[in-house]
């Protein structure tokens, strides 16, 4: 069963009917990384990736993301990758894998809210 917490960026159990393609990285038969994509619309498939903690910082996420993006293109779909800008590791993976920022989502919060989040300063 792949619909578990450790693969929650690559696959989405609540929307498993949209998961259409995946690629994995293995070491000695053990799945150590997984990239999956969901058909969020007819023409564009979203890529998500997870790598087991002990295998991170070895280029596995980028290799999986890049490979899956090429596979998506072979299906005549547009691959896309979403992450929060605060998730710096994920944003770096996207850029390393050949993606470029196309849009940015912003959230506005009151100054009081921000001050409280910053320790009441």
Where are these regions (language model features)?
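Short amphipathic alpha-helix that is part of the acyltransferase structural core
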Residues: 1-14, 121
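A conserved beta-strand-loop-helix scaffold within acyl/acetyltransferase catalytic domains
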Residues: 14-44, 49-52
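Long alpha-helical, hydrophobic tracts
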Residues: 31, 53, 70-74
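Conserved glycine-rich acetyl-CoA-binding loop
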Residues: 44, 52-63, 88
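Conserved acetyl-CoA-binding loop-helix of GNAT-fold acetyltransferases
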Residues: 57-71, 92, 96
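Conserved GNAT acetyl-CoA-binding A-motif
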Residues: 72-84
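Short, highly charged C-terminal tails/helix-capping segments
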Residues: 85-93, 98-99
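Conserved catalytic-core motifs of GNAT/GCN5-like acyltransferases
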Residues: 100-117
């Amino acid at each position: 069963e792949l619909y578990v917490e450790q693969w929650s960026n690559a696959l989405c159990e609540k929307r498993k009917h949209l998961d259409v393609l995946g690629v994995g990285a293995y070491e000695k038969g053990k799945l150590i990384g997984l990239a999956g994509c969901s058909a969020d619309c007819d023409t564009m498939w979203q890529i998500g990736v997870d790598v087991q903690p002990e295998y991170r910082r070895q280029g596995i996420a980028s290799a999986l993301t890049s490979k899956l993006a090429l596979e998506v293109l072979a299906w005549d779909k547009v691959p896309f990758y979403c992450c929060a800008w605060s998730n710096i590791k994920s944003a770096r993976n996207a850029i390393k894998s050949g993606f470029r920022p196309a849009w940015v989502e912003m959230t506005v919060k009151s100054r009081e809210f921000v001050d409280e989040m910053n320790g009441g300063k």
